[in-house]
A protein has these predicted regions:
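Mid-chain, well-packed structural core segment of small domains
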Residues: 53-90
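Well-ordered alpha-helical segments embedded in enzymatic catalytic cores
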Residues: 46-50
């Protein structure tokens, strides 16, 4: 399973376009890949560009915080079968990965509309 998150320079999970890096943790290989966030500097279509990137990287799960996705990017992610680990707030990425089994218990294929960016 490949689990992705957008992270800040300080290592906190953030909304898709709001962190300069994307980290993908591969549970089978037990390794982490770090990429520059392709939507970080865009003016438009930021979230959709990131979803396209995540799909190109064969991501299975996205760790998300409220307003990580907009309705368009969420629709694309859902249609392509991405699953979500929903956090109530930004947390350190390492903390989530260290407790991954706990977070995977709440793995979902949907995000409530009130958590999408307007």
């Amino acid at each position: 399973m490949r689990i992705a998150a957008t992270i800040t320079k300080e290592g906190y999970i953030e909304k898709l376009p709001d962190g300069p890096h994307i980290i993908i943790f591969d549970t089978q290989k037990e390794n982490t890949e770090k990429y520059d966030n392709p939507g970080y500097f865009l003016k438009e279509g930021r979230r959709s560009a990131i979803v396209d990137f995540l799909l190109d990287q064969k991501t299975d799960v996205v760790i998300s915080v409220p307003e990580a996705f907009c309705s368009l990017s969420y629709g694309k992610a859902k249609q392509k079968g991405l699953k979500f680990i929903r956090l109530e707030k930004s947390l350190p990425y390492e903390e989530v990965i260290q407790n991954l089994s706990k977070y995977l218990e709440n793995l979902t294929d949907s995000i409530p509309e009130d958590e999408l960016a307007k």
